[in-house]
Amino acid sequence: MENHVSLKVVSPALYYAIQDLRAHTNNFLKNQKMKPLSPGHYIIQPSANSKVRSLITKQQHPRKVTLPCNCHFTIHHECNRGFSHRGTYYSPSGNKFRGIRECTESTVYETPMVREIRANLSTEDTNPIQLQPPESVESSQVLDRANDNRIEQDIDWTPFLEGLEKETRDILG
């Protein structure tokens, strides 16, 4: 049975273009399989003998990068920036990251003032024992403030405790 179009055909070229599109769509759907994703949701996947790719775009997953030093990174699929690791800068090229050069300079912008301050900082401490802050004799501020937050009410707990005692006797008695 031949496919019929319920459109008013303006030109023969348009008619044949529509027929060609329908034939392509029918062949595409014949060679596809429906894969269940969850109840009520399906995705069309090409069968083994189909040369036509699915029109549904493939979901992109994060990129997993393994560096030469055997360190592993997971990078978002939309990230197109490079990164440096252990002195080597890795730039993105397509789906792979490749090491370009050794990083000898810092990635932080350094002014002469920053270099001077960094040179004056000593990283070695001659005293191996770390000094602790002196203890104060005054009461701590936390305990002083805890008393301010208390609700000052005169509550008579006697009826509550007597009722609790009676229920306990009834259960155990």
From Swiss-Prot:
Oxidoreductase in keyword set: no
GO biological process terms on file: symbiont-mediated suppression of host innate immune response
Intracellular or extracellular location(s): Host cytoplasm
Substitution effect: R150W: In strain: Infectious clone pBCT028
Single GO term (MF): structural molecule activity
Zinc finger residue ranges, unnamed: 69-85
A cellular component term, taken from the record's GO annotations: host cell cytoplasm
Predominant subcellular localization, coarse grouping: host cell
Record Pfam families: Gemini_AL2
InterPro entries on file: Gemini_AL2
Keywords: Host cytoplasm, Host-virus interaction, Inhibition of host innate immune response by virus, Metal-binding, Suppressor of RNA silencing, Viral immunoevasion, Zinc, Zinc-finger
Domain of life: Viruses
Domain notes: The zinc finger is involved in PTGS suppression.
SUBUNIT field: Monomer. Interacting with and inactivating host adenosine kinase 2 (ADK2) in the cytoplasm. Interacts with and inhibits host SNF1 kinase.
Assigned protein family: Belongs to the geminiviridae transcriptional activator protein family.
Function: Acts as a suppressor of RNA-mediated gene silencing, also known as post-transcriptional gene silencing (PTGS), a mechanism of plant viral defense that limits the accumulation of viral RNAs. Suppresses the host RNA silencing by inhibiting adenosine kinase 2 (ADK2), a kinase involved in a general methylation pathway. Also suppresses the host basal defense by interacting with and inhibiting SNF1 kinase, a key regulator of cell metabolism implicated in innate antiviral defense. Determines pathogenicity.
Protein name, as recorded: Protein C2
Origin organism lineage: Viruses, Monodnaviria, Shotokuvirae, Cressdnaviricota, Repensiviricetes
